């Protein structure tokens, strides 16, 4: 049977108190909508239709060519939202999943189980349900004495008895596609909210004596719909717990999982050690044997085998194997550290490549530079790469020794095996095998200090 999907993503999310559409708030590095779409993709739908409304262009940009889009210009309820997909789906044979775009914790495996249950029981509609300790605010699943689903009642429309029911509607369903759109023509706004409830189609099916079933989630957390920042924080916590657990099962050591923040798309090899208070974001990849110590922050970067990062920040950079970084180093975007490089405390590297076995031990800024292998930067070295309007490149060859407190004014080239004297300002090219000295000659004036107030003889 052919599968289709409708993702409901039109709402503003007033309780989020945000200019950003609700479904675009992030959980573990992805928007809620992206989490839902990935779960939906596990069922291999022939067509996915996303219903957009508030700031539709922003929502569409997230999925781009991954979905069809239909516009719900007025938000008149979930039933009305699904009606918007009629022109795309109504005439197709198959089964259609309807899911809200603000349910980021739903697992693809659960959706596949829901579809299998729906098909194997020959239902016209199947509701994804969950058991809630506190069901307040959720629609309730009402069953008869034979445990058959007879209707869904929204919180505001529920009787006192119905409000005691703990089985709740998660807002996710599978329908026979054609019957769904036929039933939608029969619903109305005769309810406390004055909206078209999608749940009313369940009553229509029951009145027609058609088979309606319910598949209950084993994990209530999957049912969480995010309507405010409190729920967003809860979703974040649950998702990060899942992510961390998966990495540990796969051979990664997390010394304190509760304080480790790893985004959804981060890839980590076995035998990586991650200490407390580490954050890994975006498209980061950590290779085997790496050690990330307390307080390290890495985004969109590759960290090579057996590299040690100590309390440092790495952004959009590539670090090869056997490198040491930190403490308190900062690699800004487009930096490359080749094998066995050492970047020490209070060193900043920006848009530069450092060749194999190069060392910048402390208090150094390297920007817009191409550095060869086995180069040593003395403390206090600065590449002066910006004149207020343009950035300029520094090229440093192999086996160069840069003396402490050197200021290198780009653009220039320092040749292989050259040296710069400590304290020099270098503003011209330095030839191969040369030493560059760019500082004033020292002059000692004997006895001069005796005239100054600090001298003991003058106190």
Curated annotation (Swiss-Prot):
Reaction(s) catalysed (UniProt annotation) = alpha-D-glucosamine 1-phosphate + acetyl-CoA = N-acetyl-alpha-D-glucosamine 1-phosphate + CoA + H(+); N-acetyl-alpha-D-glucosamine 1-phosphate + UTP + H(+) = UDP-N-acetyl-alpha-D-glucosamine + diphosphate
Compartments where located: Cytoplasm
User: How is the cofactor bound, in the record's words?
Assistant: Binds 1 Mg(2+) ion per subunit.
Question: Which CDD domains does the annotation name?
Answer: GT2_GlmU_N_bac, LbH_GlmU_C
Pfam families for this protein? Hexapep, NTP_transf_3
Q: In which pathway does it act?
A: Nucleotide-sugar biosynthesis; UDP-N-acetyl-alpha-D-glucosamine biosynthesis; N-acetyl-alpha-D-glucosamine 1-phosphate from alpha-D-glucosamine 6-phosphate (route II): step 2/2; Nucleotide-sugar biosynthesis; UDP-N-acetyl-alpha-D-glucosamine biosynthesis; UDP-N-acetyl-alpha-D-glucosamine from N-acetyl-alpha-D-glucosamine 1-phosphate: step 1/1; Bacterial outer membrane biogenesis; LPS lipid A biosynthesis
Keywords in alphabetical order = Acyltransferase, Cell shape, Cell wall biogenesis/degradation, Cytoplasm, Magnesium, Metal-binding, Multifunctional enzyme, Nucleotidyltransferase, Peptidoglycan synthesis, Repeat, Transferase
Q: How would you classify this enzyme at the top EC level?
A: transferase
Q: Which GO terms describe its molecular function?
A: glucosamine-1-phosphate N-acetyltransferase activity; magnesium ion binding; UDP-N-acetylglucosamine diphosphorylase activity
Q: Which domain of life is it from?
A: Bacteria
Q: Where is this region: Linker?
A: 230-250
Stated role: Catalyzes the last two sequential reactions in the de novo biosynthetic pathway for UDP-N-acetylglucosamine (UDP-GlcNAc). The C-terminal domain catalyzes the transfer of acetyl group from acetyl coenzyme A to glucosamine-1-phosphate (GlcN-1-P) to produce N-acetylglucosamine-1-phosphate (GlcNAc-1-P), which is converted into UDP-GlcNAc by the transfer of uridine 5-monophosphate (from uridine 5-triphosphate), a reaction catalyzed by the N-terminal domain.
Q: What is this protein called?
A: Bifunctional protein GlmU
Give the source lineage, highest ranks first: Bacteria, Bacillati, Bacillota, Bacilli, Lactobacillales
């Amino acid at each position: 049977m052919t599968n289709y999907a409708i993702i409901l993503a039109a709402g503003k999310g007033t309780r989020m108190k945000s200019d950003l559409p609700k479904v675009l708030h992030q959980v573990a590095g992805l928007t809620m909508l992206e989490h839902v779409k990935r779960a939906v993709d596990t069922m291999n739908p022939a067509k996915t239709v996303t219903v957009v409304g508030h700031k539709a262009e922003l929502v569409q940009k997230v999925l781009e060519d991954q979905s069809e889009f239909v516009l719900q210009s007025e938000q008149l309820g979930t039933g009305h939202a699904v009606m918007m997909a009629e022109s795309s789906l109504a005439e197709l044979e198959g089964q259609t999943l309807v899911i809200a775009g603000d349910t980021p914790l739903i697992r693809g495996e659960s959706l596949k189980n829901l579809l299998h249950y729906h098909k194997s029981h020959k239902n016209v509609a199947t509701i994804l349900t969950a058991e809630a300790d506190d069901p307040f605010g959720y629609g309730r699943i009402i069953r008869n004495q034979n445990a058959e689903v007879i209707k869904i009642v929204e919180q505001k429309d529920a009787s006192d008895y119905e409000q005691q029911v703990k089985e709740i509607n998660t807002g996710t369903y599978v329908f026979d596609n054609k019957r769904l759109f036929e039933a939608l023509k029969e619903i109305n706004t005769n309810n406390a909210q004055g909206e078209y409830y999608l749940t009313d189609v369940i009553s229509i099916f029951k009145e027609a004596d058609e088979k309606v079933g319910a598949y209950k989630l084993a994990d209530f957390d999957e049912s969480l719909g995010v309507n405010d920042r409190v729920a967003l924080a809860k979703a974040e916590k649950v998702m990060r717990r899942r992510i961390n657990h998966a990495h540990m099962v796969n051979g990664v050591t997390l010394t304190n999982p509760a304080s480790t923040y790893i985004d959804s798309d981060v890839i980590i090899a076995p035998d990586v050690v991650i200490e407390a208070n580490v954050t890994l974001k975006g498209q980061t990849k950590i290779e085997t044997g790496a050690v990330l110590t307390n307080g390290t922050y890495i985004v969109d970067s590759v960290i090579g085998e057996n590299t040690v990062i100590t309390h440092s920040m790495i952004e959009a950079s590539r670090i090869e194997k056997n490198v040491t970084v930190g403490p308190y180093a900062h690699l800004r975007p487009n930096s490359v550290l080749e094998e066995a490089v050492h970047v020490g405390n209070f060193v900043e590297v920006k848009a530069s490549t450092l060749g194999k076995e190069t060392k910048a031990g402390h208090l150094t800024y390297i920007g817009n530079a191409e550095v060869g292998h086995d180069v040593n930067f003395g403390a206090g070295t600065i590449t002066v790469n910006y004149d207020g309007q343009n950035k300029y490149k520094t090229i440093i060859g192999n086996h160069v020794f840069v003396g402490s407190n050197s200021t290198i004014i780009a653009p220039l080239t320092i040749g292989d095996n050259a040296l710069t004297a400590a304290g020099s300002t270098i503003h011209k090219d330095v030839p191969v095998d040369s030493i560059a000295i760019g500082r004033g000659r020292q002059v000692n004036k004997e006895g001069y200090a005796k005239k100054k107030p600090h001298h003991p003889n003058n106190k």
